[in-house]
């Protein structure tokens, strides 16, 4: 690929299944060393690299002699605090041996929900790129709450890729590519080398959603991550975590792993934030006429097109917009709370003031705050 010859922004996510030995949870130092060497080669070629690394809880469990991953949130958070220091020390030792500076960035969903924090995070990553520093990112497990957790580092890596406007997202896992089903369990499983943008939304494969004994991800979360990343214009690759050097070959055009074609990237960073940075708090169901107005004519969503709603949300919250079949059409920032919208749904805009007793916005969701899914 000719684009691979130019300096690119790369996000590389390595999972616990690749970082830790399954029988003990201890760090697989040979794999980490190979990853570090690969990343340094990428930097040497002029690429900008962010590394999203799992493993803090797994390493903490090993450090404390625990034989299984804890279930309780407080215990997981405490163990993550133990493991994160050990994990970063390992990275720092290995990168320092190659004279490569690194930085630690711990994120929660809050940093992506709040627009100011989102922009600040973007600026921090850009400054690190300019300094030639590799950012090593993990979820801040020690302070994250359930409502503001990414849930898995596959999702985190996709959102980071969207945030930094990456060209590539590499998801390193314990298989060499995506298969029609788990090849470790199904002898008839066949490899899927390429998933085109139009195919990804309908992709149905039998996957193990449980992940490894020490991690939280599985192939299902990687497909979800691919949908987020490719929707943000980021080409995504699933490849083997124990062979990180394959990243170099893939950038040169090698047919390795499974590649997910990227959709055209929106130049509007704020709309990417609405689509992927925010956590929707409700759903709005619209009629066929409203669907046509939004998709074909680029209009704002009006109250007359709203037929039902779901969830509790406030004005300016992110909501999912659904078509008459209940399929997600897009996302946007709503101008009314759920109680107000329940009263005015189906009404013409000029009738809203009489029903609410005050003058509100003409639109339920303005087109500037609306992001439609690609077909």
UniProtKB/Swiss-Prot annotation:
Class of the enzyme per the UniProt entry, highest EC level: transferase
Record-linked InterPro entries: AceGlu_kinase-like_sf, Asp/Glu/Uridylate_kinase, G5K_ProB, Glu/AcGlu_kinase, Glu_5kinase, Glu_5kinase/COase_Synthase, Glutamate_5-kinase_CS, PUA
Entry GO CC: cytosol
Localization (cell): Cytoplasm
Pfam families in the record: AA_kinase, PUA
Keywords: Amino-acid biosynthesis, ATP-binding, Cytoplasm, Kinase, Nucleotide-binding, Proline biosynthesis, Transferase
Swiss-Prot/TrEMBL GO biological process terms: L-proline biosynthetic process; proline biosynthetic process
PROSITE patterns reported for this sequence: GLUTAMATE_5_KINASE (PS00902), PUA (PS50890)
Ranges of residues in domain PUA: 281-359
Superkingdom, natural source: Bacteria
Residues noted as binding substrate in the record, renumbered to the chain: 54, 141, 153
Catalytic activity line of the entry: L-glutamate + ATP = L-glutamyl 5-phosphate + ADP
The enzyme's E.C. designation: 2.7.2.11
GO molecular function, one term: ATP binding
Chief place of localization: cytoplasm
Nucleus keyword on record: no
Residues reported in the UniProt entry to bind ATP: 13, 173-174, 216-222
Entry-linked PANTHER family: GLUTAMATE 5-KINASE
Protein name (record): Glutamate 5-kinase
Organism expressing this protein natively: Synechocystis sp. (strain ATCC 27184 / PCC 6803 / Kazusa)
